[in-house]
């Protein structure tokens, strides 16, 4: 759904260690038995050459749209790197927002902070090491997909940073108004399944301090 980029819009190659496309190939494609792997040319990822027409490639490969979007929500309410309030996904209305396809994104600072806690960047809040730019599918690609699977389960980033922030943004996505200010809220208008863990669903309440 997305990939890192630099400030000039150059897409990170799959040889870049934290590459999302590289992780897709390693953790998905290469886990198939060699005799069961689909042809490599059927595995699509971002490059400098295809970013301008990636939405068209999705529609061409999927006979009109993607069959399935598998996703989770970011702290800022994004899906993929469709961050709210960015120039890339600026729109005057929700209807216009839903027509926007793949593009280069100057990520919001909260997204960068969240990503800095991922194991690929050391799970340590190292903002200097964490990319500030990306390329991403757009609302058009997500909204038009035939089916959707969302996961809300309070995971961990590496060995630290329990993602308790998910509780609030998940509630906004699932139960709040459908708005471009919470891009992931568009899933409310889509066919699909949202998995919500018991830990995620429990009430938001004050936590007791533990004496050390």
Feature locations, PLM:
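Structured catalytic/translocation cores of nucleotide/phosphate-coupled proteins
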Residues: 9, 14-26, 60-65, 87, ...
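Active-site histidine-anchored catalytic micro-motif
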Residues: 1-14, 65-68, 79-107, 132-133, ...
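Flexible, active-site-adjacent loop/turn segments at secondary-structure boundaries
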Residues: 77, 133-135, 185
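Glycine-rich beta-strand-to-loop/alpha-helix junction loops that act as flexible
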Residues: 71-75
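Ligand-binding beta-strand-loop-alpha-helix segment within the catalytic cores
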Residues: 1-70, 129, 196
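Gly/Ser/Thr-rich active-site loops/lids in small-molecule metabolic enzymes
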Residues: 84-128, 170-188
């Amino acid at each position: 759904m997305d990939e890192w980029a630099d400030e000039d819009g150059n897409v990170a190659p799959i040889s870049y260690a934290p590459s999302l496309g590289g992780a897709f190939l390693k953790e998905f494609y290469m886990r198939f038995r060699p005799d069961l792997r689909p042809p490599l040319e059927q595995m699509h990822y971002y490059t400098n050459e295809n970013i301008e027409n990636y939405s068209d490639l999705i529609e061409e490969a999927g006979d009109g749209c993607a069959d399935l979007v598998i996703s989770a929500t970011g702290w800022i309410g994004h899906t993929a790197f469709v961050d709210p309030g960015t120039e890339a996904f600026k729109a005057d209305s929700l209807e216009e927002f839903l027509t926007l396809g793949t593009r280069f994104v100057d990520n919001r600072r909260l997204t960068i902070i969240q990503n800095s806690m991922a194991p690929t960047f050391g799970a340590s809040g190292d903002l200097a090491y964490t990319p500030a730019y990306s390329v991403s599918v757009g609302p058009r690609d997500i909204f038009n997909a035939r089916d959707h699977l969302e996961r809300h389960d309070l995971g961990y980033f590496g060995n630290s940073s329990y993602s308790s922030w998910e509780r609030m943004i998940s509630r906004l996505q699932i139960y709040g108004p459908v708005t471009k200010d919470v891009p992931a809220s568009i899933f409310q208008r889509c066919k699909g399944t949202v998995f919500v863990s018991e830990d995620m669903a429990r009430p938001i309440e004050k936590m007791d301090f533990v004496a050390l």
